[in-house]
């Protein structure tokens, strides 16, 4: 047990070890709800500057750590950050998200993409992750993250976020051959990027397939799942002991399929009751989630009740407490503090299943 005592709490739970309470972190825990972040944003208005200048990205990543001591500290970045390294020019517009300047619509454009060389294209990622590991030591788990092939393809083909995804669905259903070529190239690049993050200090990596919930289950099986598997298989070949998390927004219809991806942990959103998620996924699949981010607008008693409800339903093994998606920018900062305080005071012995 000597090794376990110095292994951070979240990493132990993610590996399936028995812990005394669920570890807790929050998606988008570094962000606009924090005054410290808003102050820094005034000095660095460009998202790419905030996420790619190492000293700034390190400071942002550590803001929630210094304020709340979550069990996970995640790299401050964006899922589209590696795209320029493949030859896909992009920017991140404040409040609007990624913008792809020349959306990929033709065979020629896809042929021109080149393999990702992270040491050349993304050296700042190594600097940031090494600094985070150095700062938190064994007191917290450092998380990296990547976008999934379908979701990055959706941005690259649409040119920006979309409500209908009509352009990429047009490609998927009328010219699937070139989309499969793009998805393959993206999967291989994402695997390289995830390995680079792990080699740079990430102890757990989460893959965001944010837009795969826009697919029917049969199309998920064609355009999302095989490429999630391709990424995870490549990462596991070289880093078999690094826990991998998969998140799909709006995943209620594909939850069981997510467990087939090769991920160690399935992130569950609030549209599925955690007890139902556990029943659907089976006892061997670890889970993350799944409070509605809006719960943090409620009273302290309401927040506490919802935390306890989720933890009871998830049970005392293989659960990482989190929101079902990112914390909302309008969330009162003191409620986030209360969420973390309450979660860290829990003990499975005192939470009746």
From Swiss-Prot:
Organism: Nostoc punctiforme (strain ATCC 29133 / PCC 73102)
UniProt EC number: 4.1.1.37
Short name of one Pfam family: URO-D
Protein name according to UniProt: Uroporphyrinogen decarboxylase
Catalytic reaction equation(s): uroporphyrinogen III + 4 H(+) = coproporphyrinogen III + 4 CO2
InterPro entries membership: UROD/MetE-like_sf, Uroporphyrinogen_deCO2ase_HemE, Uroporphyrinogen_deCOase
Quaternary structure, from the entry: Homodimer.
Metabolic or biological pathway: Porphyrin-containing compound metabolism; protoporphyrin-IX biosynthesis; coproporphyrinogen-III from 5-aminolevulinate: step 4/4
Gene Ontology CC terms, in alphabetical order: cytoplasm
């Amino acid at each position: 047990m000597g090794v376990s005592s110095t292994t951070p709490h979240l990493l132990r739970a993610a590996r399936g070890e028995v812990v005394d309470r669920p570890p807790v972190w929050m998606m988008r825990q570094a962000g606009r709800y924090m005054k410290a972040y808003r102050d820094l944003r005034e000095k660095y208005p460009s998202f790419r500057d905030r996420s790619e200048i190492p000293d700034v990205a390190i400071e942002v990543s550590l803001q929630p750590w210094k304020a709340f001591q979550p069990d996970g500290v995640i790299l401050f970045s964006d899922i589209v950050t590696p795209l320029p390294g493949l030859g896909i020019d992009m920017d991140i517009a404040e409040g609007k998200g990624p913008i792809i300047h020349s959306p990929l619509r033709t065979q020629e454009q896809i042929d021109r993409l080149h393999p990702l060389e992270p040491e050349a294209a993304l050296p700042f990622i190594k600097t940031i992750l090494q600094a985070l590991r150095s700062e938190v030591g064994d007191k917290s788990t450092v998380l990296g993250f990547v976008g999934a092939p379908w979701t990055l393809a959706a941005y690259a083909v649409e040119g920006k976020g979309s409500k209908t995804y009509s352009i990429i669905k047009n490609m998927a259903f009328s010219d699937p051959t070139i989309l499969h070529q793009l998805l393959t190239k993206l999967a291989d690049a994402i695997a390289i990027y995830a390995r680079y993050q792990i080699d740079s200090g990430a102890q757990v990596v989460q893959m965001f397939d944010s837009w795969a919930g826009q697919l029917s289950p049969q199309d998920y099986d064609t355009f999302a799942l095989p490429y999630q598997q391709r990424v995870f298989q490549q990462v596991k070949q070289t880093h078999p002991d690094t826990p991998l998390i998969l998140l799909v927004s709006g995943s209620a219809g594909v939850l069981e399929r997510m467990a087939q991806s090769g991920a160690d942990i399935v992130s569950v959103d609030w549209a599925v009751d955690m007890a139902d998620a556990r029943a659907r996924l089976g006892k061997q699949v670890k889970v993350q989630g799944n409070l509605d981010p809006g719960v943090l607008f409620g009273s302290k008693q309401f927040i506490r009740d919802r935390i306890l409800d989720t933890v009871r339903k998830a049970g005392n093994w293989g659960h990482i407490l989190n929101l079902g998606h990112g914390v909302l920018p309008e969330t009162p900062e003191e409620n986030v503090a209360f969420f973390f305080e309450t979660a860290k005071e829990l003990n499975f012995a005192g939470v009746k299943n």
